[in-house]
Amino acid sequence: MKKLLKSVLVFAALSSASSLQALPVGNPAEPSLMIDGILWEGFGGDPCDPCTTWCDAISMRMGYYGDFVFDRVLQTDVNKEFQMGAKPTATTGNAAAPSTCTARENPAYGRHMQDAEMFTNAAYMALNIWDRFDVFCTLGATSGYLKGNSASFNLVGLFGDNENQSTVKKDAVPNMSFDQSVVELYTDTTFAWSVGARAALWECGCATLGASFQYAQSKPKVEELNVLCNAAEFTINKPKGYVGKEFPLDLTAGTDAATGTKDASIDYHEWQASLALSYRLNMFTPYIGVKWSRASFDADTIRIAQPKLATAIFDTTTLNPTIAGAGEVKANAEGQLGDTMQIVSLQLNKMKSRKSCGIAVGTTIVDADKYAVTVETRLIDERAAHVNAQFRF
């Protein structure tokens, strides 16, 4: 049985190293792997011994914590209906722009994100008790990247406006939704922290069964927003938008004169519980574990308008191309805006984990019972790699 357990853990650790989410599982035997310190010798006392003091029971570890999520499995967390203008029904020509919102099927409902990445570098600090329990925290910085279909971000605009003017009416609302485009965003590098606890619950020879619980939080700002859409393509550096505001947006939305806007930021929260089994083989301690986690990315459903000019130049305020191929903007004529997309905007919808369960496989290398390096990969609910290097005082 021992040989079988050794074979399974070693094979899993080595074979997974070639395939690289945001909280690692960690080695379940970590609280008891480093039993000696660089400044103070370890003490393996009995907690029931009346002569044992808390000074003998407590030790500290510090080190580097790196977690690199290459693809988190996310989906949107939105309502089934979305308020915007009625869908156009005219077969030819233009029509009056809608001025009232109606409930339509939300194209963002249940959408899967194409890519979600997060990279964290932090300092790791752990308080160890009786070489069996760890209470730890990380303090560092994180940055992220999100990419998805434009429908996931409720990219909308107004098409076919029959007005004879260089701007749309004040009460006009969008009537078209885009689902054949791509939206991507990059966040800045911002402060991130996490706390957790880990315990070696059961030991039998060289095998250890352990459990852990962790919570992480960060709130990065959106550094750059790219909308890759043939009808309305644009890029915004440090975008700002409206929170809690329904259509119609102000006519100044997207211009330098816009008011009532705030910086776009994403509030990230995640909790995770895990159970793992390890087996020590001299310097190496491979392990395999399962985890249950829930992550949320909430940007307050901020709505960001396409950048445009406050006053028209050459009878246009944006560089959006013609849709039906008119080839020119006819000034002082009905429908002069009808062939280009107007009042384009999108919103950053709340996202959550699409899968809750995942597996983690890794190994820890211990040197002189004072130093340790852990390498881990995680699969199913995310694809990620984790590195932890630490020493005991």
UniProtKB/Swiss-Prot annotation:
Pfam families cross-referenced by the UniProt entry: Chlam_OMP
Entry keyword annotation includes Transferase: no
Subcellular location: Cell outer membrane
Molecular function via GO: porin activity; structural molecule activity
Gene that produces this protein: ompA
Biological processes, Gene Ontology terms: monoatomic ion transport; regulation of cell shape
Cleavable signal peptide: 1-22
Membrane topology: Multi-pass membrane protein
Protein name: Major outer membrane porin, serovar L1
